[in-house]
Design a protein with these regions (language model features):
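Short C-terminal tail/terminal secondary-structure segment
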Residues: 2-3, 247-272
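N-terminal Rossmann NAD(P)H-binding glycine-rich loop of SDR-like oxidoreductase domains
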Residues: 18, 22-27
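Rossmann-fold cofactor-recognition segment
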Residues: 46-61
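Catalytic loop of short-chain dehydrogenase/reductase
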Residues: 84-85, 90, 113-184, 196-197
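Catalytic Tyr-x(3-8)-Lys segment
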Residues: 155-160, 211-230
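Short, small/polar-rich loop/turn modules that mediate ligand/substrate recognition or access, typified
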Residues: 183, 188, 246-248
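C-terminal substrate-recognition "lid" of short-chain dehydrogenase/reductases
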Residues: 224-253, 258
Length: 272
């Protein structure tokens, strides 16, 4: 049974491994036996990663250099790097969406059958059905510059809540890309959709969403905010054989907030 969760002998790549969920995942992967872990980030991680490649996920050239350096044979790719909505719209989309796609498409052809791709999405992206047609239009644009131009041309949609929109794209991209990744390469693609997490990024989320909204969300799901370790455990699990039959799934990890919302057990009075 323990082999189901083992990372022994696996080549792993993780983006955003310096702080928060990524840093917690680095520790857990080491505990699970991973001895070939490459972290892509703009800052060097302090955890037990075996290799660090300085990478700017908003810059296609930087990503391409990382892909060349990584080489083939990646068993598990964690697309974890992300930014909050306090940044300019095009920057958020480049990091949270375009960078994820470029890295994935560069690494995937060299991944062995049975591998896994795990994206970090968010429950903030659960409104994707309302924008599905536009999101598929965006996903259908292969060229980086053209995709950035699409964001500018659709500024009213993208800028209304750019973080939420970027995570809508992340959820749809997970489903969309999972079809090709599994049919052509035998590689599963899933995402984790957390609620509010107690990480250094929380300050940016408070600026963007207000502390009242964050606390209200936590209060509606048991009153306990998620920790980086909570979500890292879910990420790490999705990269193992324990989730062998899962593909194209956006796994919600929010202490039950979405369940309460879906079943009309939410108290909106806390929003004022």
């Amino acid at each position: 049974m323990s082999d189901l969760f083992s990372y022994e002998g696996k080549k792993v790549v993780l983006t955003g491994g310096t702080t928060g969920v990524g840093a917690a995942a680095v520790e857990l992967l080491a505990e699970a036996g991973c001895t070939d872990l490459t972290v892509l980030d703009i800052k060097e991680p302090t955890g037990p990663a075996t290799r660090y490649i300085p990478t700017d996920m908003s810059d296609p050239d930087s990503i391409d250099e990382a892909i060349a350096s990584i080489g083939s044979g990646v068993d598990v790719l964690f697309n974890n790097a992300g930014v909050a909505g306090v940044h300019p719209t095009d920057f958020v989309i480049r990091v949270n969406c375009l960078g994820v796609r470029r890295l994935t498409e560069g690494v995937l052809p060299g991944m062995p059958k049975g591998g896994a791709i795990v994206n970090t999405a968010s429950i903030a992206g659960q409104g994707w059905p309302d924008n599905l047609a536009k999101i598929l239009e965006f996903i259908g644009i292969d060229d980086w510059a053209s995709a950035v131009q699409w964001v500018a041309d659709n500024d009213e949609l993208a800028s209304a809540d750019v973080y939420a929109f970027s995570k809508q794209i992340a959820q749809v991209w997970t489903m969309y890309s999972s079809v090709r990744s599994f049919k052509e390469f035998g590689v599963r693609t899933n995402s984790v959709c957390p609620g509010p997490i107690d990480t250094p990024l929380m300050d940016d989320f408070i600026k963007h969403m207000t502390e009242q909204v964050i606390q209200w969300t936590v209060d509606q799901s048991g009153g306990t905010m998620l920790t980086a370790d909570d979500i890292a455990r879910t990420l790490v699990m999705l990269g193992t054989d324990a989730s062998l039959a899962m593909n194209g799934h956006n796994m919600v990890a929010d202490n039950g907030f979405s369940a309460a919302m879906t079943t009309s057990q939410i108290d909106f009075s806390g929003l004022g």
